[in-house]
Amino acid sequence: MARGSAAAAIAGVVWVLLLLVGVASGARLPGGSGGNRGREPRGGAAAAAVATETAVFALGSFWRSEAAFGCLPGVIRTSVGYAGGSKARPEYRNLGDHAECVKVEYDPRLIQYKKLLEVFWASHDPREVFGQGPDVGNQYRSIIFTNGSVEARLAGLSKEKEQAKDRRSVITTQIQPIGAFYPAEPEHQKFELKRKPFLLQLIGNLPEEELLTSTLAAKLNAYAAELCSPNTQNRINSKIDEIAKKGWPILRDI
């Protein structure tokens, strides 16, 4: 009996030591969440919580529009949807009077609203009427949606500046307060990225909800459309080549 009690006591001490080591190392323990807690999510490094601001623009097909903003430093996430109309619950095949839009969430410490306006003007032809390029229809009209008087003033000034570049034709861009924004269907989110299955594999084939919120996915969506700056495009090319040589680990940042 004494020998059995001693053995039981030793086993108990060993179990306690193993338990302490497991907790210290973050290992998964029976019945607990253990090592998953605090683990960096797929699709990009975990970012500290920041107070983001949101801008919404309509500048033609939202497939391309989303990519135009995704690679900008300070842009946290992008998504596409419908706004500017009166129809409740619009859908891609039944938009009503809405326009295709891109919603840009950004860190104002790293990028200013003025810069987003510059990209907006540079990414489409605001003098076209009833569409953009091959995309014809009211849903492709040019709109700056504003949130408050400061954005409205900046948008107005930027429009005047754009108009002054050429007085022979009129800027058709509307400026209006943002109302309801209806997210588009999942198949339209990160459209350019989804056309490159190779890139999706590099970030672990994220589920739709993670693609929607991932900063890395927003950047790769722009990269897939070749809308990052030349330096950024080259840097991502090098990063992808490096990953391929290492045996296809998950891409976590660029």
Swiss-Prot record:
GO biological process terms, semicolon-separated: cellular response to oxidative stress
Function description: Catalyzes the reduction of methionine sulfoxide (MetSO) to methionine in proteins. Plays a protective role against oxidative stress by restoring activity to proteins that have been inactivated by methionine oxidation. MSRA family specifically reduces the MetSO S-enantiomer.
InterPro entries cross-referenced by the UniProt entry: Met_Sox_Rdtase_MsrA_dom, Met_Sox_Rdtase_MsrA_sf, MsrA_MetSO_reductase
Range of residues in the leader sequence: 1-26
Keywords, ordered alphabetically: Oxidoreductase, Signal
Family: Belongs to the MsrA Met sulfoxide reductase family.
GO cellular component, as recorded: cytoplasm
Enzyme class (EC, first level): oxidoreductase
The name this protein goes by in its record: Peptide methionine sulfoxide reductase A5
The UniProt record lists the keyword Signal: yes
Catalytic activity field: L-methionyl-[protein] + [thioredoxin]-disulfide + H2O = L-methionyl-(S)-S-oxide-[protein] + [thioredoxin]-dithiol; [thioredoxin]-disulfide + L-methionine + H2O = L-methionine (S)-S-oxide + [thioredoxin]-dithiol
Pfam families per the UniProt record, alphabetical: PMSR (PF01625)
EC number(s) on file: 1.8.4.11
GO molecular function: L-methionine-(S)-S-oxide reductase activity; peptide-methionine (S)-S-oxide reductase activity
